Each structure stands twice: as C-alpha cells, then as structure tokens.
C-alpha cells in the first residue's frame, strides 16, 4: 500500500518521505501517524489521487470533494499539497469567507463549483494561473477585485499570476473559487441581457452575484446581502469598492484610429463609436454583439467616449507645450550662460561710457548697422595669455575720405601668427535696438595718430584705447598728448613693432575722453567728423603715449 502511494506522490513529497525514513522513522510509525492525522485513510488517498489526475481524467462527485473542502475550511492545510512548495507568503491565512460560503451551500450549482475547483487544484498551478490571467485580461477585470473578494495579498497574487510564484493550496482554492463563480456570473449577465430588454442588470435572480462582484455599498458598516440564499454566510470582510471602468484594447484601437481622423467628433460620431466599441468588446469576450448590455460596468457609453477624446486633446496640448519649452529652453539657457560667463555684459545706453561693459553696439537710423562681439582665442608660444579681439563696426556716417583702413594702417603682426584682418572680425547685421549708441571702429594706432594730427583742438572726441595686463582689466592713468603728433607718430610705430615681437599682446577696452579742460561728458559737433576709434597697442607703446605732453588731457578709464 505504501509503495503504491509513493508512486503517486510528487518528487518533493517523495524526498520528504525519504528524509523521514532516513531520520529513523519506520514505515509502521509513519503509517500510524498518517492514520492519526486523518481518521479516514481512503479519503486521504482520494485527495492524493485527485491532485495527480489530469483535467480530463475523471470528475469528482460531491461526496469525494467534501473532504477536501472540509480540510481547507477547518484549517487542516498545514500538510502541503501540490503547489505549496516554496511559498513565499509566510503569513497565516485564515479561511476566506468565499470558501466558507461555498462549503455551506448544498445546492447543485455549489456542488458543480466544488467539482470544478477540485479539478483545477489537480492541475499544474502555473497552467491554472495563466488561464485565470488570460480570462481577467479578456474581460478587463482588475486584480483589486480578486483581492477584495478572496482576501489575498495583491503582491503575492500578481507574482503568482505573472511569474508562477508558488501559492498555498488554501489560497489557490480561494482564487479558483472566485474564478469559477466569476465565469458563471458573467455568463449569466450576457444570457439575461439576451432574454430581457437589456436595460436593467440588477434583477432578483442575479442580485447576489452582482452585489458580490460589483457591489456599490453606500453604508460602510453594511455587509453583503444575498436575499435568495438563506444558508449563505455573510463574509465579515471590508467593504467592496466599485469597479472602475477600464478601456479594453479593442476599444482603444478603434478610438485612436478615430482620433487621427477627427480630434473632436460630433455627438452622432461619438454614438457610432459607442456601437463599434461595444461590438468589439463583445467579440473580445467571445459573445454575440447583441449581448452588449451584458458587459456590465465595462459597457461603453457616449459620455465615456466624450471624456476619452477630451483627455487625449489635453494630453496632446501638454506634450506640445513640453516640446516648445524644450525647444526654447536651450537657447535661453545659452544666452544666460554667455551673459554670465563673458567678462563684458551689455547694458543700456543710460550707463556712463566708463562703466559700459557691453560688447554689442547699435545706433538708430535706417542706414546704420550693429555688430555683436566675436571673441577669438589665438594661442602661441610667444604669447602667454589669450588674445581677446573686440570687434566694432565702422559706421556708415563716417566720411570715406578719411581712409582709416589704408595700407599703412595694417594690424601689427606678432610672432606665432598675425591678427586676422578687420573684415573677418566684423559681423554686421541690422539694428533692431531701441537705445542709441555712439558708432565705433576698429583701427590701428597709426590710423589714430593720422587722424589726431588733423583734428581741430576745439572739437572734443572720444578715443577708446585697448590695454590689458595678464588678461585682467587695469585702470589707466590720464595720458597727455603732444601737439607734435606727426613727428612722434613714426617713432612710436617703430618702437611698437619691435616690442610686439617680444612681448605678449595684451588687449582690453578703455575709453579715452579728449576734452579742453572740462569735466563734462564730450559732445560731438557733428557725428560724421570723427566717431570713436579703437587703438590697438602694447604696453611700451602706451607708455610712449603717456609720456607725451599736450594741452589735450585724455583720461583713460577701464571699460
């Protein structure tokens, strides 16, 4: 007898029996322990046989299935059955009310349900889990509903359905009980929708099932009422929540296709979509479209279609806003980064010239242009610091006869490479600025000397001078210009060409205001006479300028 029983056990159960025998327990003692555990050995054998039967092997009768439910409902589930191996849910699990209710019923329908549950318990747990999961997806049933009815842990239920995580037999029995009753309840809904007018679903024949699975209690302390069954036991569990409507994959496909055609359909179009969606939902469940009212809470209505389209339009508008923010964000952040990282920050024209740190110059007028600064870094062995070349635009109002950029006014070349020509340093674009700025010009020292020689002493001019020491701004002292500018011009240029080949080129922007013994800001008598000029020089040449004596005092201020 024992040998025949071993042949019907699973591999794990055989290992457990072998371990018991290896521990010193004899067969007689083990058989006596089994008889003491269950006074009906034949009933115990039936349970083991039922666990190994194939789904089509045989159908258990009501009398054969009662001992199993008797064991499950009376807490004798400590001895593991098939599917209990390695259960990760170690919490104690009281007998769920759904099992107690099914055990207490003596109707023919309850007997059929118990037989179906026994058959599922005998199957492979993973196969049964996949079957239940597919049924839930087909009918858009959330896991929360199963948790509310069976009392299972939702995490454990999800792992069992998705990954086949082992689950105790008592818990699987509760899950299978819900599955069997849910199948019958949905089938009853569709059948009654065909027989009746389909307008109402809460008739007295199926009110108990609807209250069980689609309960909408208004009172928190009220239990589930089943008027048609006097022997039913009221489950003392928490209040069941109403099922939330969930769009099925078939309906979503139809709605998305309609959204591509029309984002805001009319009422007639929405009603046509309702019929199409309900038809697809019925076909998904394997029932006739004429039974659409049997969908229950999953029935598609015109209001739900309207809300779906409204939500899609909101989502699309939100995505467009995010895309616009992402597009304009980098440009804004780049401008902010350049304005903070650059040593020169643009300011309005209301600031005094000595404190202006702007690198963009503009002026009003139809024929005037502006330029934005381009900073070019030239590294060389003979240059210890980077060179910052500030570009300014020659104004259109400047008289062409001055010939400031003549061949004799070339940029001073240094060892390791010369500066790029003025044409490559100048970026001319249209002026759209509101404030007015004095036009500026890049020119070498020779050009400044040539113009300064021909200036009238009664006219006040502005000459910005570039000078820098080790890449940092320095405040410059006032420079005295000699009246014999023409005589010292050639000497200055000869000295500057020699020093530039030995010393590093140092450049910054400074303003040199020339005015006849007055502290007021200079005023131009005519803007076309001489606009501000840019002087490019080195330290020794600047010292030569400072040594000149003249009645024109030119204080240099760091820009």
Swiss-Prot record:
The keyword RNA-binding does not apply. GO terms for cellular component: nucleus. Residues 240-320 bind DNA. Pfam families: HNF-1_N, HNF-1B_C. One of its GO terms (molecular function) is DNA binding. It comes from Danio rerio (Zebrafish). Residues 53-98, 334-384 are annotated as: Disordered. Binds DNA as a dimer. Can form homodimer or heterodimer with HNF1-alpha. This is Hepatocyte nuclear factor 1-beta-A. PANTHER family: HEPATOCYTE NUCLEAR FACTOR 1 (PTHR11568), HEPATOCYTE NUCLEAR FACTOR 1-BETA (PTHR11568:SF2). It is found in: Nucleus. Residues 5-36 form the HNF-p1 domain. Residues 334-354, 370-381 have a biased composition (Low complexity). Its main location: nucleus. Residues 85-94 have a biased composition (Acidic residues). Keywords: Activator, Developmental protein, DNA-binding, Homeobox, Nucleus, Transcription, Transcription regulation. It comes from the Eukaryota. One of its GO terms (biological process) is hindbrain development. During embryonic development, expressed dynamically in the developing hindbrain, kidney (pronephros), gut, liver and pancreas; expressed in both intermediate mesoderm (precursor to the kidney) and the caudal hindbrain (including rhombomeres r5 and r6) at 10 hpf with expression diminishing caudally by 14 hpf. Strongly expressed in adult kidney, gut, liver and swim bladder; weakly expressed in brain, eye, testis, ovary and heart. Transcription factor that binds to the inverted palindrome 5'-GTTAATNATTAAC-3'. Required for induction of rhombomere r5/r6 gene expression in the hindbrain. CDD domains: homeodomain. Residues 100-195 form the POU-specific atypical domain. Residues 1-35 are annotated as: Dimerization. Belongs to the HNF1 homeobox family. SUPFAM superfamilies: Dimerization cofactor of HNF-1 alpha, Homeodomain-like, lambda repressor-like DNA-binding domains.
């Amino acid at each position: 007898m024992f040998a025949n029983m071993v042949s019907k056990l699973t591999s794990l159960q055989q290992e457990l029996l072998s371990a018991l025998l290896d521990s010193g327990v004899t067969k007689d003692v083990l058989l006596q322990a089994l008889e003491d555990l269950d006074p009906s050995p034949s009933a115990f054998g039936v349970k083991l046989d039922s666990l190994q039967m194939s789904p089509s092997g045989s159908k258990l009768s009501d009398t054969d299935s009662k001992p199993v439910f008797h064991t499950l409902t009376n807490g004798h589930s400590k001895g593991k059955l098939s599917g209990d191996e390695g259960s990760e849910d170690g919490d104690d699990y009281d007998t769920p009310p759904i099992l107690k209710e099914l055990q207490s019923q003596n109707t023919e329908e309850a007997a059929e349900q118990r037989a179906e549950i026994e058959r599922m318990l005998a199957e492979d747990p993973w196969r049964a889990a996949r079957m239940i999961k597919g049924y839930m997806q087909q009918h858009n049933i959330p896991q929360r509903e199963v948790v509310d009815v069976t009392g299972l842990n939702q995490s454990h239920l999800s792992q069992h359905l998705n990954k086949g995580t082992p689950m105790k037999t008592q818990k699987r029995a509760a899950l299978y009980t819900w599955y069997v009753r849910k199948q019958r309840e949905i089938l009853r809904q569709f059948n009654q929708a065909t027989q009746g007018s389909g307008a109402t679903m809460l008739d007295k024949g199926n009110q108990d099932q609807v209250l069980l699975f689609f309960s909408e209690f208004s009172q928190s302390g009220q239990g589930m009422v089943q008027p048609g069954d006097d022997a039913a036991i009221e489950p003392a569990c928490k209040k069941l929540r109403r099922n939330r409507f969930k769009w099925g994959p078939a309906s979503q496909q139809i709605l998305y296709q309609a959204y591509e055609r029309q984002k805001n359909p009319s009422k007639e179009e929405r009603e046509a979509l309702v019929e199409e969606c309900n038809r697809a939902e019925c076909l998904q469940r394997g029932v006739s479209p004429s039974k659409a009212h049997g969908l229950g809470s999953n029935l598609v209505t015109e209001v739900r279609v309207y809300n779906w389209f409204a939500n899609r339009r909101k989502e699309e508008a939100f995505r467009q806003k995010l895309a616009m923010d992402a597009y304009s964000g980098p440009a804004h952040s780049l401008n902010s980064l350049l304005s903070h990282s650059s040593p020169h920050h643009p300011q309005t024209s209301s600031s005094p010239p000595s404190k202006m740190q702007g690198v963009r110059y503009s002026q009003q007028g139809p024929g005037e242009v502006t330029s934005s600064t381009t900073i070019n870094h030239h590294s060389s062995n003979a240059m210890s610091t980077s060179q910052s070349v500030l570009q300014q635009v020659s104004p259109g109002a400047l008289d062409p006869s001055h010939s400031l950029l003549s061949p004799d006014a070339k940029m001073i070349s240094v060892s390791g490479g010369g500066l790029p020509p003025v044409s490559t340093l100048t970026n001319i674009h249209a002026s759209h600025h509101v404030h007015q700025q004095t036009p500026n010009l890049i020119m070498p020292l020779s050009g400044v000397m040539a113009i300064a020689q021909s200036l009238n002493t009664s006219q006040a001019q502005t000459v910005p001078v570039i000078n820098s020491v080790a890449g940092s701004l320095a405040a410059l002292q006032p420079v005295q210009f000699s009246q014999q500018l023409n005589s010292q011009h050639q000497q200055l240029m000869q000295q500057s060409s020699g020093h530039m080949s030995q010393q590093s080129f140092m450049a910054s922007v400074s303003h040199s205001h020339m005015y006849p013994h007055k502290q007021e800001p200079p005023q131009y008598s005519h803007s076309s006479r001489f606009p501000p000029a840019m002087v490019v020089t080195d330290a020794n040449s600047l010292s030569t300028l400072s040594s000149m004596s003249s009645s024109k005092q030119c204080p240099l201020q760091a820009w």
